[in-house]
Design a protein with these regions (language model features):
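Glycine/small-residue-rich loop that forms an oxyanion/phosphate-binding "nest" at active or ligand-binding sites
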Residues: 57-99
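Generic structural signal for well-ordered alpha-helices
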Residues: 21, 25, 43-44, 77-78
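Active-site-adjacent beta->alpha loops and helix N-cap segments on the catalytic face
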Residues: 18-19, 37-56, 67-72, 95-102
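Short active-site oxyanion
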Residues: 29-36
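Generic N-terminal amphipathic, Lys/Arg-enriched alpha-helix
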Residues: 1-29
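Hydrophobic faces of well-ordered beta-strands that scaffold small-molecule active sites
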Residues: 3-11, 36-38, 56-62, 88-90
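Conserved, mostly hydrophobic/aromatic
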Residues: 8, 46, 80
Length: 102
C-alpha cells in the first residue's frame, strides 16, 4: 500500500533557506507526496516549483504559537492563497480555546 499521497512534506524551520525549500519540492515530486507545507513567505517559491505537478502547496497560518488576532490570521491566509497556496494549516490560539472564546 502506498501512503505517499497522504503525506504533507513539511519544512517550517525559521532558518530554512530557499535551496532547502526547493529540495523539499523536489522530494515531494520524487515521492509523490500530497503537499508541501511551508511558512507563508515560501508559498510563491513552492507554487512555482510545483506548478503542474499535482502537488498542493500548504501554508501555515499563525505559526508557531497561534497567539495572534483572527484578523491577522485571516490576512495571512488570504495572502497565502493569493500567492498560490491551496491548503491552509492554522494554529489555534490555545488560551482562547481553553477559555471557550473560539
Amino acid at each position: 500500500m502506498n501512503y505517499a499521497d497522504r503525506i504533507d512534506h513539511t519544512l517550517l524551520k525559521p532558518e530554512a533557506v530557499p535551496e532547502q525549500i526547493r529540495n523539499l519540492c523536489r522530494e515531494a515530486k520524487e515521492y509523490g507526496f500530497h503537499s508541501v507545507c511551508v511558512n507563508s513567505s515560501y508559498v510563491p517559491l513552492c507554487a512555482e516549483e510545483l506548478k503542474n505537478s499535482g502537488i498542493a502547496v500548504c501554508s501555515v497560518v499563525g505559526f508557531p504559537l497561534g497567539a495572534m488576532s483572527t484578523r491577522a490570521k485571516a490576512s495571512e491566509a488570504a495572502g497565502a492563497v493569493l500567492d498560490g497556496a491551496s491548503e491552509i494549516d492554522m494554529v489555534l490560539h490555545i488560551g482562547m480555546v481553553k477559555s471557550g472564546n473560539w
